[in-house]
Amino acid sequence: TVKEGAAAAGLGRRSLIKRSLGAALGLVGLTPLLLLRDLGPLPKDDFSKTSWEAGTRLVTDPGDRPIKPSDLEIGAVAQVLPELPNGKVRKLEDIGKDAVLLIRIRPEEFQLDAERLSWTHEGIIAFSKICSHMGCAVALYEQQTKHLLCPCHQSTFDVTRAAKVIFGPSARPLPQLALALDSDGYLVAKQPFTEPVGPSFWERDSA
């Protein structure tokens, strides 16, 4: 079943972050994600193109299990990746670009405009895990304040306000991934990211 698969992948209720103290998210086996520049050159054109497309299912990382809204309780946060086509092998550089944080709060806690609110689903919101300052992994979540924190330079983002920067050197919010449900009730991307993923200091074309 879906819940059995989710539990096996580490997305079961006991494994989700439910305490108010920040905790590291999904970093086991992903140490290179902490500073993406250590992976080697990441040209702007390659970095800005992620694997997310309209209709791509969100899957657990680790585990590659598709996710339904019922798998996430209020206060939960999980790292997810785009589902791979059959036979395709996930590359480390793709994980660096594609990693997303999935967070569930009470819908009434959002302070979003109509468009951004339409990108959420029943209190579930998704952001790129890659800090928009220097490309580190945003790895801490404080449940009471609904803040995400990058441990490298302490950039802090408000989940309720579309990951608006409220502290630290980052110049822009974390890109938000629009969510929807497919015909089987699994969470999918409504569309690709509408803004570049990754550090602001790299110049990119807006297209």
Language model region names:
Residues 134, 153:
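Short Cys/His-rich metal-coordination motifs, predominantly Zn2+-binding knuckles/fingers
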Residues 9-47:
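N-terminal twin-arginine translocation
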